[in-house]
């Protein structure tokens, strides 16, 4: 039987011979990590066995290079991967750690379910509950919260989640709300944000979910992002960087001149609405910016304007100045999420 694919996506990998960092399509399997030069490649460029390997995160071997994790194999070979942002790295770290633990214990990898262990009523459909929580009108309101000189965008508080469950009569009391919330967390419908909730979720606290206004959580597809506050009040950000970050990640972008496709890290901001793109392997300055106010964004099934690059999951942004940008997501779901987020941003601010 083929090993199960646990997680896949773009990460930047450090070369093992030369000190170069390049974006790779990385696939986490139950027994190892495969990395490909392109998502469409049939055979991997390399494979890292996980049996006996150790994981180091955060890895601070490279100074300014953020969100790096290190895997050391039994042969003492180090492999370094860099994620686009903190939450992406944390998600990879959680799954790699769990895969290594499952190999050690001779178990199959499975997303942890607390339904049986906490005697959750069979009548509760966590998927349906999640959709109710995300309802724009009746669901939980996402907040921008500040703590320890960090701003947490699009997040929820532990006590806020339980308040909502109680007020909507979905649970009889806060204790029952705590059980349901722990299940939502373990099934991946909620993610921990910030040290307090992460430590609890990792098993340091008695309950993996905390009924506290200081414990922060977020929906996995909400555009959550945590950013450091500048302590220097004299720093005036350029206008286009003032907006709140609502989504980020890697996409393929077609060049305007040569029409070739390259992996780029994208950061979407609203009010003012800008989409900045970067070389994912380095450099803090963007390669370019797309002003989204009044733009049109649509999915593209096939187009003579698009030089063929495995034509699935393409979408196009046409700016108010009629500049065309062609982008490609890794999956249909990811394409839909980006289109929706860009449409929302394009209607805000300047």
From Swiss-Prot:
Residues found modified as Phosphoserine: 113, 117
Keyword Nucleotide-binding in the entry? The reply is no
**In what residue span(s) does the DEP domain sit?**
136-221
Q: Where is the PH domain?
A: 4-101, 244-347
CDD domains xrefs:
DEP_PLEK1, PH1_Pleckstrin_2, PH2_Pleckstrin_2
Q: Which Pfam families match?
A: DEP, PH
Sum up the protein's function in the record's words.
Major protein kinase C substrate of platelets.
Write down what this protein is called.
Pleckstrin
Question: Which gene produces this protein?
Answer: Plek
């Amino acid at each position: 039987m083929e090993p199960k694919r646990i997680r896949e996506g773009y990460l930047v990998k450090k070369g093992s011979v030369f000190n170069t960092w390049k974006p790779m399509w990385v696939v986490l399997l139950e027994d190892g990590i495969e990395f490909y030069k392109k998502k469409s490649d049939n055979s991997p460029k390399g494979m890292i066995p996980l049996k006996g390997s150790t994981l180091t995160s955060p890895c601070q071997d490279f100074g300014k290079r953020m969100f790096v994790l290190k895997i050391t194999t039994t042969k003492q070979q180090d492999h370094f991967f860099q994620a686009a942002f903190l939450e992406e790295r944390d998600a990879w770290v959680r799954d790699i750690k769990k895969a290594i633990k499952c190999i050690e214990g001779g178990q199959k990898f499975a997303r942890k379910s607390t339904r049986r262990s906490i005697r959750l009523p069979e009548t509760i459909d966590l998927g349906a509950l999640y959709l109710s929580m995300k309802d724009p009108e009746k669901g939980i309101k996402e907040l921008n919260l500040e703590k320890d000189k960090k701003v947490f965008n699009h997040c929820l508080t532990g006590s806020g989640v339980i308040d909502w469950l109680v007020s909507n009569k979905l649970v009889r009391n806060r204790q029952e709300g705590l059980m349901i919330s722990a299940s939502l967390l373990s099934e991946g419908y909620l993610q921990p944000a910030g040290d307090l909730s992460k430590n609890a979720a990792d098993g340091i606290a008695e309950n993996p979910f905390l009924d506290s206004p200081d414990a922060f959580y977020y929906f996995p597809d909400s555009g959550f992002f945590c950013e450091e506050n500048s302590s220097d009040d004299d720093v005036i950000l350029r206008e286009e960087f003032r907006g709140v970050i609502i989504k980020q990640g890697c996409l393929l972008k077609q060049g305007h001149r040569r029409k070739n496709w390259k992996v780029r890290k994208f950061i979407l901001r609203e009010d003012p609405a800008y989409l900045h793109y970067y070389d994912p392997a380095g450099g803090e300055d963007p390669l370019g910016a797309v002003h989204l106010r009044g733009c049109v964004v649509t999915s593209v099934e096939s187009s003579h304007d698009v030089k063929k690059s495995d034509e699935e999951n393409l979408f196009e942004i046409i700016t108010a100045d009629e500049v065309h940008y062609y982008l490609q997501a890794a999956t249909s779901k990811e394409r839909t999420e980006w289109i929706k987020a860009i449409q929302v941003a394009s209607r805000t601010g300047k």
